[in-house]
Amino acid sequence: MANYDVLKLDGTKSGSIELSDAVFGIEPNNSVLFEAINLQRASLRQGTHAVKNRSAVSGGGRKPWKQKGTGRARQGTIRAPQWRGGGIVFGPTPRSYAYKMPKKMRRLALRSALSFKVQENGLTVVDAFNFEAPKTKEFKNVLSTLEQPKKVLVVTENEDVNVELSARNIPGVQVTTAQGLNVLDITNADSLVITEAAAKKVEEVLG
């Protein structure tokens, strides 16, 4: 267990929290982390690429010339692959690039990503975001007070509409929940700002 300061939104210390070394203090497994990032990026691919094969290209129903007697090579259709404007052989077809990863590996990847952020001093724990209404200017001031870099991932315990709307128009700032935390978002961010309740929830899931 390691102690971390819990900050108020004005930057002052409100207390401390013990975070489990099993979640936030392991030696990052780079190979599993790399595999998890590739898996997530692969699942984001649309896979809608397609070309027309000889059956999909329009035309070509008539035989170009008779089979014998012309001295030329026999041809059955002008949409065969060797013809200009013909179908493509073995071209890309629509498919899903998604693949699966064992649950233990996925959890190890998340723990590795969180531990990596801790090692880089990229983890900030706050007591809570108590926004009564969406306030982008106020949210920017909070990030500035907490001395956060441009790319920040904000993690709340549950969905918080006011926080999401406050951060929506700030470039480089992304908001997610403890349940929706993923490796790609963590590694893309320079810093992680997590609420005390969200940190405990992450420990419950990954611990």
Swiss-Prot record:
Signal peptide: none annotated. It holds the Pfam family Ribosomal_L4. InterPro entries: Ribosomal_uL4, Ribosomal_uL4-like, Ribosomal_uL4_dom_sf. Residues 50-76 are annotated as: Disordered. Keywords: Ribonucleoprotein, Ribosomal protein, RNA-binding, rRNA-binding. GO terms for molecular function: rRNA binding; structural constituent of ribosome. It comes from the Bacteria. One of its GO terms (cellular component) is ribonucleoprotein complex. GO terms for biological process: translation. Coiled coil: none annotated. Belongs to the universal ribosomal protein uL4 family. One of the primary rRNA binding proteins, this protein initially binds near the 5'-end of the 23S rRNA. It is important during the early stages of 50S assembly. It makes multiple contacts with different domains of the 23S rRNA in the assembled 50S subunit and ribosome. Forms part of the polypeptide exit tunnel. Part of the 50S ribosomal subunit. This is Large ribosomal subunit protein uL4.
